[in-house]
């Protein structure tokens, strides 16, 4: 995969990766942070919880995300954003579907990427990062890299086969199917159409859309806390 994430994310934001240039020195870190929180679609409770866990829980795992980023060429803040959405950085997180840990890894995925102990945060973070990198490399959907990244995030949440089948319903030539088109299709789809189960009235298709949006929000907040300013005229996802 080389440096595809490094190139892509640098092109979408200012100083998203270690090698990117810092933002305009006339803009303070406080201004960047305030602006990013104001633009976030998260509610106040979610914002406050994120800030609390960023201060009191995340530091324990920062080096693990750095190591996973180096091993996979995926930017650290993106991995940390995925992990926050998955588990709120709780190494013992688990769901009734059997997924566990920081990146909520399944048994099948653990076997694929060599994770022996899913509740081991370092193994889980590196395993989830490897799996995400595999999904991105294998993804054939999307005319742009921005589309491909959003579609890969949806695949991490909903499963790559399900997302591929949705894309095929839109166009047999899936490489021309955009994330916007997939979102429009997912909104109309119930769980049974995806061989999944809806939770009450919350459809699995809508869950995948919300998942991508929330990872985007958390990514931008993590970048802002690192004194990194996304370009307002560009959309990350």
Protein language model features and the residues they cover:
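Short, functionally critical alpha-helical segments immediately adjacent to catalytic or ligand/cofactor-binding
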Residues: 66, 73-90, 128-129, 152-157, ...
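Catalytic and substrate-binding regions of cell-wall glycan-acting enzymes that process beta-1,4-linked
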Residues: 35-38, 153-221
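N-terminal export signals and maturation junctions of secreted/periplasmic proteins
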Residues: 7-11, 18-66, 91, 225, ...
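Extracytoplasmic
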Residues: 60, 74-79, 84, 97-100, ...
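Substrate-binding/active-site groove segments that recognize
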Residues: 92-116, 124-133, 191, 215
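Secretory-pathway/luminal and periplasmic proteins that interact with or process carbohydrate-rich
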Residues: 87-96, 135-138, 158-170
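Second-shell loop/turn segments in exported
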Residues: 48-55, 65-68, 91-93, 111-122, ...
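Surface-exposed patches in mature extracellular/periplasmic domains of secreted proteins
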Residues: 77-80, 119, 140-153, 227-231
């Amino acid at each position: 995969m080389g440096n595809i994430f490094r190139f892509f994310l640098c092109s979408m934001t200012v100083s998203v990766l270690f090698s990117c240039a810092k933002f305009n020195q006339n803009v303070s870190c406080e201004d960047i942070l305030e602006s990013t929180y104001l633009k976030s679609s998260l509610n106040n409770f979610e914002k406050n919880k994120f800030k609390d866990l960023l201060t009191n829980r995340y530091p324990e795992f920062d080096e693990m995300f750095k190591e996973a980023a180096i091993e996979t060429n995926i930017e650290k803040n993106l991995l940390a954003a995925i992990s926050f959405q998955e588990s709120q950085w709780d190494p013992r997180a688990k769901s009734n579907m059997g997924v566990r840990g920081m990146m909520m890894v399944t048994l099948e995925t653990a076997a694929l990427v060599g994770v022996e102990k899913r509740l081991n945060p370092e193994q889980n973070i590196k395993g989830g990062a490897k799996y995400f990198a595999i999904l991105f490399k294998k993804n054939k959907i999307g005319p742009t890299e921005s589309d491909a990244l959003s579609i890969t995030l949806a695949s991490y949440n909903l499963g790559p086969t399900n997302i591929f089948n949705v894309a095929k319903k839109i166009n047999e030539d899936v490489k021309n199917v955009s994330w916007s088109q997939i979102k429009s299709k997912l909104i109309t789809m119930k769980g049974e159409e995806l061989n999944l189960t809806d939770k009450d009235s919350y459809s699995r298709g809508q869950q995948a859309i919300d998942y991508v949006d929330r990872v985007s929000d958390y990514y931008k907040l993590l970048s802002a806390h690192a004194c990194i300013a996304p370009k307002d005229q560009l959309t990350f996802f």
